[in-house]
Amino acid sequence: MPGSFLPVTPEEVAQRGWDAPDFVYAVGEAYVDHPSFGHAIIGRVLEAAGYRVAMLCLPEYHSAEAFKRFGRPKLGFLVSSGVIDSMVNHYTVARKRRNTDVYAPGGRAGLRPDRAVTVYCNRIHEAYPGIPVLIGGVEASLRRFSHYDYWDNKVRRSVLVDSAATLLLYGMGENTILDCCDWVRRGMPAHELPRLRGVCYMAKQPPRDALLLPSHAEITADKHAYCRAFLLEYQEQDPVRGHTLCQQQDAQRYLVQNPPALPLTRQELDRVYDLPFTRLAHPMYDAQGGVPALQEVRFSISAVRGCFGACSFCALTFHQGRIVSSRSEESLLKEARLLASFPDFKGYIHDVGGPTANFRQPACDRQLREGACKNRQCLYPTPCKHMRVSHTELVSLLRKMRAIPGVKKVFIRSGIRYDYLMADKSDQFLTELCRYHVSGQLKVAPEHISPNVLARMGKPRREVYEAFVERYNAVNRKYGLNQYLVPYLMSSHPGCTLKDAVELAEYLRDTSHQPEQVQDFYPTPGTLSTCMYYTGLDPRDMQPVYVPKNPHEKAMQRALLQYRNPANHDLVREALRLLGREDLIGFGPHALVPPRTIRSSAERYSREKAASRAKSAHTYGSAPARSRVPASHRTDRAAPRQGGRRAGAGRKGGGR
C-alpha cells in the first residue's frame, strides 16, 4: 500500500524523530514518488534498507545555502540530474533553449542548472568540504568516461573528475547503491573498492587486472584513438564477461570502471516495485500545477529492463545493458489491481512496457551464463539463430490484465521491435496487440529506409519493415480495424547523405505518408552514433562515415522528409538540383515539389494532409510521425514527452 513521502523539509525530518538524515539526495527534478522516476526508487530502496534519506529536489544552485538545508548529513550526499541528461533536457538539437521542462513544477524551465551533477557537487563541496558524495543517474552514467560533448563541441573528461565526487554509480543501481552506502557507513575502506560492481572511482595507478583504454589526452588528439577507446567501453559493458576498465584522465589520476552490476532477478525486481510508493507528485507542487511528467506515467506499468536491440543511436547498452530482465506476472497484475483501485483511475492502463514492449526475457539461454556476445548483435543484421523468440508469456499477462475488474483497456505505447515480432512465426501476439492493445496508433521505429543509413544505425533492412507493415495491415483488415502505424523517422544520422534523404522522400511519396515532424539526429554521450558523428569513423570497422554537420544541409535533409509542406519547397528544390534530380520537380505523379511555390498552397496542403491521413489508414496503415527528444536517452520505457517522443534517456528505474 502507498506510504508517506520521504521528508523534504527539516521540520519533516524532526517529525520522524531523526536528529539528522543519513543521506541528503539532491535531484535535478521535482519530487515524484512514482517508480517511473529514479530518485523515487533509490529513495525507497534506501528507506527499506533502514537508511534515513531526505529529498532535496531542484535546489537553488547559485550558492551553497540550499545544500545546508538539512544540516550536515551523517553519511553523505547523493546526486542525480534526474531521468534525463540536463543538457538534453535544456537544449534542442539546434542548441536552442527549450521553453518548458516537464520534470519541473508547472513545466517551468530554468529551475535546474546546465550540467546539474557537476554544479550540485560543487555546491556540496562548498557547503561541507570532504563529505562523501555519490553521483548516479543518466547524466553521470553516460558521461563516466572521457566523452565527446555536443554542446561544447569538444571531448570532456569524465564527470567524476569535473564533479570531484567520491564515487560514480552507473547503470540501474538498486543493489549498487546499497553496496556503496554500506561502504560509506563502514568508513570507505579503499581496498574494497574493486569489489563494488557498477561503480567508477579515481585511482593514482591502474589496477593490475584492468584493460587500459587510450587516455584522455590520446583520444583528444587522435580520433582513431577515440574510436578504439569507445569500442572497448562498448564491448565490455556486460555484467558476466566484462572486465575492469581504466582510463588516464590527467597526469596523476586514472578513472577505474568496475564491471557492471548484475541485472536484478525477477524476484528482486518484484520487491523493488512493491515498495510503498505514493505514486504522486509531492503536494508542495500543487499550487504550481503539479508535475507534467507524471501524467504520462501515472497509470503506466514498467514491466522490463534492458534491451538487446542495440540501435547505434541509443544509450541503453551503456546504462541498462543488453540482458533483458522482467517482473513476474503476479507482480504486474498486483500493480494493475492497485491502479484500478485509485479513485481517479478511468479504466485505462496507458502502457505496459519498457525500453521495448515485446521483450520479456534474455535473448538466449547463454546470456546469463556467458554474457551477451562481444562481436555479435542479437537482431542485427539478421536475428541470431540462438535467439529465443516467443510472445507467449506476454500474451498470457495481457489477457489476465485486461480481465481485472475496473480495467477497460490496456494499451501498449512503448515501442515494439517489429523485427523481433517478425521472427515469431505465430500471429498470436500481433493479433492480440491489434485487437486489444493499440490506442488507434502503434509506434514503430524504422528510422530510415536507405541500406547505407540503416547499416550505420544498426536497424533492420527496409524489407523487414515492409513485411511487418503488410502483416500488421492484414490483421487489422481481418478484424475490421482502422488503426495507424506511427513510424519514427530520423534525418542527418551519420552516414546519411542528401541522396539517402531523397530516397526516403520518394519512399514517403510512394506510400502516401506525410510525417508532420521528424527528429534530427542528436549526438548525446554514450552512443555509437555519437562516436561516428565526432570522429567520422565507424568504430566497428574503422571505415570513414559521411557525417552531415552543415546546418543548411541538415535543413535540406529534414525538408525532404516533409516535402509536402510548402514552407520547405525552396529547400527541397535546392537539394534536388544539387543532386541533378530535376525529374522530381514538376507536376507529375512522381514529382516531390512544383517548379515554384503556388499561391494558396499552404491552405491546400492543410486540406491534403487531413485527406492523406484517412487514405493512409486504408492503403498503408501509417499515421504522422511525431518529433522526439533523442532515443539515446530513453533508458527504460519511453520517458514523459516534452515536445514529442523522448528517448533516452530517460528513465526511470534504479541507478539514477
Where are each of the predicted segments found?
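N-terminal [4Fe-4S]-dependent radical SAM core
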Residues: 1-20, 30, 225-300
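Glycine-rich beta-alpha loop elements in corrinoid/cobalamin-binding modules
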Residues: 11, 38, 57-250, 257-258, ...
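Conserved SAM/AdoMet-binding glycine-rich loop
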Residues: 25, 41, 56, 60-61, ...
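N-terminal pre-triad scaffold of radical SAM enzymes
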Residues: 26-31, 288-315, 348
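Terminal amphipathic helices with adjacent charged low-complexity linkers/tails
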Residues: 62, 190-238, 252, 261-264, ...
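Flexible glycine/acidic-rich beta-alpha junction loops that bind and position SAM and/or redox cofactors
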Residues: 85-94, 142-144, 174-179, 204-207, ...
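Conserved, mostly hydrophobic/aromatic
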Residues: 166, 272, 307, 332, ...
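Acidic, low-complexity intrinsically disordered tails
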Residues: 376, 594-656
